[in-house]
């Protein structure tokens, strides 16, 4: 019988993490459970830095970006001895289960704790939208709005100077954020990691656009695919058009979460408590076709595949 739970946020922050913490805390308290907040993710868990949370601890948090519990990278958590200390800290505090909010690295930590016998529930909190078993992640829609706003602003200046602009978008090895932003921002070209990239093919497409009378263009590209400054130099050399690269960087992670992220985070946080009370552990929560779902966290990480939105790419190309 679960009486006390812990909650932490891990990895890169995402808008809506505070709303998810709030959802977990208030749903747990409504069911008569105690909640311990763990500072700075798995690092704080290892160092036994925790605080008891009540309803007022999460007041005025639903609209705040970031995570008030903090987050940290802690690669040492791969060590089984380190995880054993973490589990001992949880048991010492009387914590029966753990809710982890974060991306794929955070899920891996929850998976390893689960394999060591400690029940965990994972909530997908990342702007990258790269988590298996869910259509959307907490923070994705807010980041999408931020990226599209940046593209709109770049279009103003690009059109004024008849310039080609390259926009580097976060996403790690998933092109969802780039692709959605390219469609919503009316980008002329989009480059994502799911599709083989050739800079010469891109230049050929840009030249074809110029031949049709296009005066400026915006290229959206997912991070890690190439050096965007070098790409800009190459495009300018080959086309004769001034080309500049903009790396949006960590601004994409900040800001007050949009309503959908607040709703998604609240629903997922509450659902995590439902699952724990029903005796589930070692699960990850997702939303598919607007319905909350849960999957075995080990199976999700090791076996599930995340479909690429090929139809979205087809749409983007038709609208170039």
UniProtKB/Swiss-Prot annotation:
Residues annotated to bind ADP: 22-26, 55-60, 155, 186-188, 212, 214-216
Enzyme Commission number(s) from the entry: 2.7.1.11
Annotated residues for binding of ATP: 12, 73-74, 103-106
Active site (UniProt): 128
GO BP annotations listed: canonical glycolysis; fructose 1,6-bisphosphate metabolic process; fructose 6-phosphate metabolic process
Chemical reaction(s) catalysed: beta-D-fructose 6-phosphate + ATP = beta-D-fructose 1,6-bisphosphate + ADP + H(+)
Entries under InterPro entries matching the protein: ATP_PFK, ATP_PFK_prok-type, PFKA_ATP_prok, Phosphofructokinase_CS, Phosphofructokinase_dom, PKF_sf
Localization per Swiss-Prot or TrEMBL: Cytoplasm
UniProt feature coiled coil, ranges: none
GO molecular function: 6-phosphofructokinase activity; AMP binding; ATP binding; fructose-6-phosphate binding; identical protein binding; metal ion binding; monosaccharide binding
Keyword line: Allosteric enzyme, ATP-binding, Cytoplasm, Glycolysis, Kinase, Magnesium, Metal-binding, Nucleotide-binding, Transferase
Entry binding sites for Mg(2+): 104
Pathway: Carbohydrate degradation; glycolysis; D-glyceraldehyde 3-phosphate and glycerone phosphate from D-glucose: step 3/4
Main location: cytoplasm
SUPFAM superfamilies: Phosphofructokinase
GO cellular component: 6-phosphofructokinase complex
Entry binding sites for substrate: 126-128, 163, 170-172, 223, 244, 250-253
Summary of subunit composition and partner proteins: Homotetramer.
Task performed by this protein: Catalyzes the phosphorylation of D-fructose 6-phosphate to fructose 1,6-bisphosphate by ATP, the first committing step of glycolysis.
Stated family: Belongs to the phosphofructokinase type A (PFKA) family. ATP-dependent PFK group I subfamily. Prokaryotic clade 'B1' sub-subfamily.
Record HAMAP family: Phosphofructokinase_I_B1 (MF_00339)
Protein name according to UniProt: ATP-dependent 6-phosphofructokinase
Organism of origin: Citrobacter koseri (strain ATCC BAA-895 / CDC 4225-83 / SGSC4696)
